[in-house]
């Protein structure tokens, strides 16, 4: 009886230990920084000197600045285009890799690699060289007879699309999440739908997509 109580207490303390570790990390690395950011938004603060409370002056300056709404518009456009494209591409590749093959492990690693190195300085320099006025992209266009000397990252009309492409290129982490979620869908659902004569499009929209909704909005 005492042994059972000791085991129960050990499980209880272990659970409390892991729960406390999560809550401490959540509080220290999320709640505290968010609270500090909110407080500093009402202050005049330059890191080197103590913050001076200024009330709503920062917000008044922000809304009176003509570039604020333009920046907000570009940010929303970037998010509304890049996020759906990244999710769609990740889901498409995950469904292709769902079929087991000898090279599936290699493909998963290859597709995941950009997610690891995508934020590095080397990749930033590489993309800058690729899309500069005398970069690789313009050289390839000139090789097929298209005279192009535009600086893709220096042009306001094209720079946003290059940045979106850079985000979509790092779809590997989302692809692995989708791949794991797809494997959790019972095969019996697809088999029953096929017996009823349902096509692949119907199965995707009536089975796959609804069951992936929690993952998509995660």
List the model feature ranges, each with a label.
Residues 2-3:
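Membrane-interfacial, low-structure loops and terminal tails that flank and connect transmembrane helices
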Residues 8-218:
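A structural signal for multi-pass alpha-helical bundles of membrane permease subunits
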């Amino acid at each position: 009886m005492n042994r059972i109580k000791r085991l129960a207490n050990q499980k209880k303390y272990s659970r409390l230990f892991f729960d406390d570790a999560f809550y401490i990390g959540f509080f220290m690395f999320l709640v505290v920084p968010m609270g500090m950011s909110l407080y500093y938004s009402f202050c005049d603060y330059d890191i080197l000197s103590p913050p001076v409370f200024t009330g709503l002056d920062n917000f008044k300056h922000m809304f009176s600045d003509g570039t604020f709404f333009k920046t907000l518009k570009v940010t929303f456009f970037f998010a509304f285009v890049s996020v759906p494209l990244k999710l769609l591409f990740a889901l498409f590749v995950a469904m292709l890799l769902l079929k087991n093959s000898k090279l599936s492990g290699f493909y998963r690693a290859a597709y995941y690699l950009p997610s690891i190195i995508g934020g590095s300085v080397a990749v930033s320099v590489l993309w800058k060289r690729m899309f500069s006025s005398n970069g690789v992209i313009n050289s390839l266009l000139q090789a097929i007879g298209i005279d192009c000397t535009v600086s893709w990252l220096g042009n306001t009309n094209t720079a946003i699309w290059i940045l979106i492409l850079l985000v979509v290129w790092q779809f590997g982490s989302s692809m692995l999440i989708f791949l794991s979620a797809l494997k959790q869908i019972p095969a019996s659902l697809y088999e029953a739908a096929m017996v009823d004569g349902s096509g692949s499009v119907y199965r995707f929209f009536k089975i796959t997509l609804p069951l992936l909704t929690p993952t998509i909005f995660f």
